[in-house]
Amino acid sequence: MDHHKQLTLQTTLESCNNLYNLLFNSIGSIKPSQQQQQQQQNQKNTNSVTSNTNIINDQEIFKLNKFHLYGENNIDELYNSIELQLQTIKFTCQQYRQWDSTERDSIKFFNTQKLYNQSQQRGNLVSKTLFDCSLLGKIYLNQQKEQQQQQKQKNKQQQQQPQPLVEDLSKNISKTVEVKRKLGLLAGKLQEMTNELNNKYSTFSVLDDLLGLLKSNTEIDYNSDSYVSCNISSSTFLLDIDIYHNGEIKEVKLVHILTTTGEVEPAEQQFNDELTNSLKTDMKEFIKKVQRICDLDLLFRKYKHFDLQKAFSILQSDFLNISINSNIKYIDNKEIEMNKGFGEIKLDCCGVLIKYFQSYIEKISKMNEPYSIMIEMESSAVTNNGSLIDQSEYSRLSLKTLLQKQQHTQPSAQTDYSEQQQQQSISTQLTSIEFNEKDCLDCEPLSSMLESDSIFSPVRLVCKLNKPILITNQQLSKILNLSKIHRSSQQPSQQQPSQQQQQQQQQQQQKKLNSVDESMNENGDSNIIENINELIKKYSIQNLLISSSSSSSSSNDSNISVNVDNSFDCEVYGMKQRYYYTGEFELGIEISRIPIYHPSQVYPTIQLLRQQIVFNILFKSCFQNLNISKSDDHHNIIDNNNDVKIFEITSNPPNSINIIFLHPIDNSFNSIDIFIKNNGDLEAFYYDNTTNIQPNIQKSTLFTKMLIKSLSISVSLACFFKNK
């Protein structure tokens, strides 16, 4: 019994440990190998570990730039799963205590459970073996029978009309074999997918008709319009897959089941067409779409006390109204709608897809997909007492309304002046930025807005980026401040700490900082400051952008390591260029998702992302190869330095980039200041001399036009000097 209890507890602990490892891998922390652990243990035993060694080991194990809540996975959901596993361990231990009091019953229970599990496993194994043997046997018998029938037909046809009928028969046989093979592959992939869905989401799948067609011994007319149906179902959806007898996909149909009334509501035809095309062309893409449908269904079932389906319909209705108004406004210029307006909005079966940026070069070359976000629902964080931390509001309120609501909210009597000043600074910071696309295109409904049109959901919204984006901390803070405005407008009367309490907290924090400084001075560890500066430089957005551009342009040589300390040479349209980065460093992180709490946050977020994307593209354009042949060395150094134009780059991401260079004819230092607005608009100012106050208007206008079209500093400079 003790051995069985130990195994049961060990199984639970292993499950919890796997979830911990999944959490750490998701946020960028890599579990050290056994060899690394042994080396660290040996170093500890010999007391020879230095602070520098610890820092290096920590950097190898822990990826600092990925430790945030905006990566690919939902960290809160993983954390909640771990909490659930810990509760399971707690209840298991409590159950053990009860079993110890009744030892005899426990022995009988465990023996019975053990025999039951063994019998069930053996029964499942026997059933699976019988099913596989039956399937293989039927296929074999079917092939034998078909061969006999074909041989008989062949003999008869040879007697009547030998040559033509034999050829037709061979074609039919080959076609039958091909169709059987196609049906078998499709059935295998669908069965593998449905088994995974059934285990992960507790869905119910039926593939009997397809398997029956595959095992059928009767002759089938593969040219007819007959088809079989397979389906995947759950509490809130039904997915029908119609397949022709020749193995071609007829149609995929999605049906929604309302949890409140149980009524069946067919999905939009465009959603069915997307599912059908993905199943025909890309099975992996189809599986991802079905998994997203199951994820949404899992949320609907988890929060069945709340009508999430209504919240989801309100969300799609809001963006449908925005899409209609946006199409009317930009009916003659879709490029401006994509890059300057709200974006190209398209409803999805599990959310809302918004394509918000695509450069001119990418559009005409069709090399890359546009930048886009997918707005979906996801689980939010939970406090210790089980209450939800994050809640999203689904309504047709604009961001301007939220700002006005907060500005007109009267603070409570206990609210401190510093808190009021902080809230006012947030509002001022955001209102000073030109966010409103005419207040989100006046997306209120045509009829008067009802109270039921604004509801709060226990799950939050999330904007999932189709491409990870490197973003500065400053830009990310602006996005997070949008959430602060929404939350403060939800709870205007929340009691704030008094001024005395805030002063006490500040004094305690200051004492902690002073103690840390004193300990650093006593130890004389000046290397810590150097290490911090090195980390800031390593994880700066400038270094990350240069590293990504150099790795993509020199993918053939994995040993190349280009960073901000190196110069970078390139040749564009016959002009040899060399770039140095001599500016300050700004910390940056890579984000893949942005949680939001109100649909009105989407447009300001898109504007800030456009600004960051344009900065990233321009900055990287100085440090990547364009239609040139590489030299033999690792850094692509141009051998002949006589005709090389040298440019020094400084930046204030994502707002501006400054270029300083020596003019080849005037022998004077010229400079170009490039300013990037929050919506991605560009404006360049060309100064004939760094001492000049006024820019050259003609050159500034010309260089701005080149930048807007090319979104490349190196290309614009080459064309600019060639034009002169």
UniProtKB/Swiss-Prot annotation:
Record-level GO BP terms: positive regulation of transcription by RNA polymerase II
GO molecular function: transcription coregulator activity
Compositional bias (Polar residues): 511-524
Keyword rRNA-binding: no
UniProt key word Translocase: no
The protein's assembly and partners: Component of the Mediator complex.
Protein name: Putative mediator of RNA polymerase II transcription subunit 1
Source taxonomy: Eukaryota, Amoebozoa, Evosea, Eumycetozoa, Dictyostelia
